[in-house]
Amino acid sequence: MNLVFLGPPGAGKGTQANLLTRTYEVPQISTGEILRAAVKSKTPMGVKAKEYMDQGALVPDSVVVGIVEERLASPDCASGFILDGFPRTVAQADALKQVLGALGKQIEHVVSFEVDKGVLLERIVGRRVCRACGRAFHVKFDPPLVDGVCDACGGELYQRDDDREDTMRRRLEVYDEQTAPLKSYYEGERLLRKVNALEPIEDVQRQIVKLVESCNG
């Protein structure tokens, strides 16, 4: 089972990927995590990535794709994998296709997490996190008993920079610019499957499992 998850920040890709890894016993692969792991382990591509990172420069596609290739060649990917948040562009999708071809693999399904941007913004902008214990709250959907105070430990609740409305709007704009062509690309490959990501976590999970198993069947 070789999957790609597409969706805007906050759509629940990571949560669903984590649940699927337990169901199907395949690894969840996040580019941010494997980039950090490659740098820490000093793999050939990790060493190259660190050179760019030390200069404060963006890690180029060629290196990112190389790190993804290193990860996909690992033994635990033999039965499948879930790519979470990669590829982000058509150029990366083309490179991924070549990498997988060289490994004798191919993408089976690209799951697109469909969300209403207004609802998504409300979800994310309302998040609050405890500085002390890390527990998460939501000002509307899961408010603390006392405004600004953690129910669990009494710590201060704050809004992360990534959850601020101006930041989220910029991230969503970038996502739309990059991903609209990518969705068209995968539609052309007949791999794109859409799920309603605004439903409860368990319902989204059922959608994905049903979709994957029906397509496999």
From Swiss-Prot:
Chain intervals for the UniProt region annotation (LID): 126-163
Signal peptide: none
Any GO BP annotation: AMP salvage
Top-level taxonomic group: Bacteria
Keywords in alphabetical order: ATP-binding, Cytoplasm, Kinase, Metal-binding, Nucleotide biosynthesis, Nucleotide-binding, Transferase, Zinc
Enzyme Commission number(s) of this protein: 2.7.4.3
Region (NMP): 30-59
Disulphide linkage map: none
Metal-binding listed as a keyword: yes
Binding residue positions for Zn(2+): 130, 133, 150, 153
Binding site for ATP: 10-15, 127, 199
HAMAP family referenced in this protein's UniProt entry, alphabetically: Adenylate_kinase_Adk
Protein name: Adenylate kinase
Organism, as annotated: Geobacter sulfurreducens (strain ATCC 51573 / DSM 12127 / PCA)
